[in-house]
Amino acid sequence: MRSIWTGSVSFGLINIPIKMFSAVQESSLDMDMLDKKDNANIKFKRVNENTGKEVDFANIVKGYMLNDKYVILDDSDFEAADAIKTKTIDIESFVLEKEIESIYYEQPYYLEPDKGAMNAYGLLRDALQASGKVGVTRFVLRNKESLAILKPYKNVIVLNRIRFEQEIRSTDELNLPPISKKATKEMDMAEKLIDQLTEKFDITGFKDEYTTKLLDIIKKKAKGKVQKTAPKMKVVHKQGDDLMSMLKASLETKKKKSS
């Protein structure tokens, strides 16, 4: 793996040099865009809007439009905005992970101790494990400030980027039913169905089946085999009075599968 960021984790007066690596990889197939006429690859170029000429990457700068005029920024400007956060992951507090709603989670990264940091890294990892808490921190990655938590995962410390509160869109514009705690027959049946389908979560039991099937189609097409037309799926809108019968049928279906 290639590190995407180097810096340090600040834990009180302890400074832990680390390297950061992406913890995830895409499972989807890498598709290329081609010209329909001859299957030639489509290439995208960086061109000058005024001249239409291609611009070398070395000659491209970043700018911010202010009062109808661009202000050009370089690396030193981004660092000057907060030099500490560009190189330091400063733990500001510790919280219980259950206090953080799942909607805030964004991207996980592995942290690896750099030279001479094994003991301090191990101490932080093991202390987090023993406390059952996560560290809340902020740092700058790719010229953007990120909020994140630090938590142990197996034998590594994971930094999981989380979204700021202002990044979460309001639900006010959605047409939603009111929340009800009223006891009804439908609620009782729904809870029974949930109980029937409850099991211990095992991530190894879930695979990207769509990608596997798509790759199978690609291999068959490469051999000249004709693919069957996929059935058209329609969304069926059921009325409220169908809920009870559908819940009963779902429970019976589960019972038959279990027997």
From Swiss-Prot:
A Pfam family this chain is assigned to: Ku
Keyword annotations: DNA damage, DNA recombination, DNA repair, DNA-binding
Domain Ku: residue ranges: 9-187
SMART domains assigned to the protein according to its UniProt record, in alphabetical order: Ku78 (SM00559)
InterPro entries: Ku70/Ku80_beta-barrel_dom, Prok_Ku, SPOC-like_C_dom_sf
Domain of life according to the entry: Bacteria
Statement: the UniProt record of this protein carries the keyword DNA-binding: yes
Molecular functions (GO terms): double-stranded DNA binding
Iron-sulfur is among the record's keywords: no
GO-annotated biological processes: DNA recombination; double-strand break repair via nonhomologous end joining
Stored NCBIfam families: Ku_bact (TIGR02772)
Family from the record: Belongs to the prokaryotic Ku family.
Role noted for this protein: With LigD forms a non-homologous end joining (NHEJ) DNA repair enzyme, which repairs dsDNA breaks with reduced fidelity. Binds linear dsDNA with 5'- and 3'- overhangs but not closed circular dsDNA nor ssDNA. Recruits and stimulates the ligase activity of LigD.
Record's subunit section: Homodimer. Interacts with LigD.
UniProt name for this protein: Non-homologous end joining protein Ku
Organism: Flavobacterium johnsoniae (strain ATCC 17061 / DSM 2064 / JCM 8514 / BCRC 14874 / CCUG 350202 / NBRC 14942 / NCIMB 11054 / UW101) (Cytophaga johnsonae)
